[in-house]
């Protein structure tokens, strides 16, 4: 099962490919503000991690690390922007598994993982299975039973083709032997809105994105994909606990 999304925020840059030890030895880095591109909409897990990292880096390095969102096409628009950027260390990508690796494979993006140089991993993010709050199934087991009984009836949302939420849902439905229809969005905010309204049946999203909606009773969270429970949603069981 795809359990987590790895985030290399403020961390991966085409810029770093040509920014070797010689250049670093000749000048202090950073000598000016650094642009950090997040290839997703504001409020998602990658965005939150990137902003936290940018704040820490700004304080530690004496220059501003400025986060800018360039969302769309499963994260490949922002990643393409960084891949084309000048290789001087001042344009970084708050990358994730979806934007760096699966995006080029599924979306035909004009770059590959080899076009980026990893600097550090800053977070791993589990995904939570959610539906609208009044969906009839009261537990993960009941949800599975409902989906299996009507294998062609339901839909699932994601933040874009090739995103980890998309791939997690595909694996989930594949293992259940059902053919739920994928509805991709430009970011998870609109996707989650349509899940809450019942226009789309379910989705896998990060705890950061859904926590306030779970707590306010707008969505029902069934299970988290990680080995251990999420600190953000400690009352939501793991998938292993529900099977």
Where are these regions (language model features)?
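Short helix-initiation/N-cap motifs at beta->coil->alpha
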Residues: 70-78, 124-125, 160, 182-193, ...
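Short, well-ordered beta-strand elements
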Residues: 32-41, 65-66, 91, 117, ...
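Beta->alpha turn/N-cap motifs
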Residues: 94-99, 103-104, 188, 205-210, ...
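N-terminal signal peptide c-region/cleavage motif recognized by signal peptidases
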Residues: 20-22
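C-terminal lobe and pocket-closing loops
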Residues: 124, 210-243
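Alpha-to-beta junction loops
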Residues: 63, 85-94, 150-154, 178, ...
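Extracytoplasmic "Venus flytrap"
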Residues: 36-51, 72-73, 157-164
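Hinge/capping helix and adjacent helix->loop/strand transition within the periplasmic-binding protein
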Residues: 57, 84-90, 104-190, 239-241
